[in-house]
């Protein structure tokens, strides 16, 4: 518990830089505590935040997923403006608890938030062709002859990010079709695909 309060040489102590009030529990067996920060849960239990985190880990057999509110918006925007920057999502997939809203709304959030500051024709390459090129993924990320037909058809005027930290499992509005390898994987009317059309890229 003492180590949780101090910076460490062997691992990054995000708590030391953010504070327990910016560490939110997003999963676990006690549903009433999901969505609350660790400091708040600790106060309700009559424990220090460090003791509370230890108890949560024990109660959930080591699986107590959390979200850190540690980003500086000014830093994010300064990097985003760079022509060399790309945007990806590292959202984790789970059927339980509250996933990070980026799992459902990363790219719609990006477009909706910055469409008045960055032309959409400059935003789209940051989430398609540029990441594919950076990762060395051939034949994907662009609408070109011979490339895989991975296509998202959107209505820009209808596009709206719906995912929030409180209600993250919401798909964005305004996405008409998602096409994977030339086959329709998702339609805006809620109709899903009859199969899985993607494959592992290594």
Residue ranges and their predicted role:
Residues 1-113:
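Active-site neighborhoods of metal-dependent hydrolases
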């Amino acid at each position: 518990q003492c180590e949780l309060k101090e910076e460490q040489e062997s691992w990054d102590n995000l708590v030391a830089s953010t504070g327990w009030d910016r560490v939110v529990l997003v999963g676990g067996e006690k549903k009433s505590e999901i969505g609350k920060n660790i400091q708040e849960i600790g106060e309700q239990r009559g424990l220090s935040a460090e003791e509370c985190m230890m108890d949560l880990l024990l109660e959930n057999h080591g699986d107590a997923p959390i979200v850190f509110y540690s980003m500086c918006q000014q830093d994010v925007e300064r990097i985003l403006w760079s022509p060399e920057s790309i945007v990806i999502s590292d959202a984790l997939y789970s059927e339980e608890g509250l996933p990070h809203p980026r799992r459902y709304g990363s790219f719609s959030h990006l477009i909706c938030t910055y469409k008045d500051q960055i032309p959409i024709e400059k935003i789209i390459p940051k989430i398609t062709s540029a990441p594919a090129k950076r990762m060395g993924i051939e034949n994907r990320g662009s609408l070109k002859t011979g490339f895989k037909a991975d296509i998202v058809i959107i209505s820009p005027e209808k596009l709206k990010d719906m995912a929030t930290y409180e209600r993250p499992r919401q798909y964005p509005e305004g996405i008409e079709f998602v096409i994977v390898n030339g086959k329709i994987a998702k339609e805006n009317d809620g109709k899903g695909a009859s199969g899985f059309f993607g494959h592992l890229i290594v």
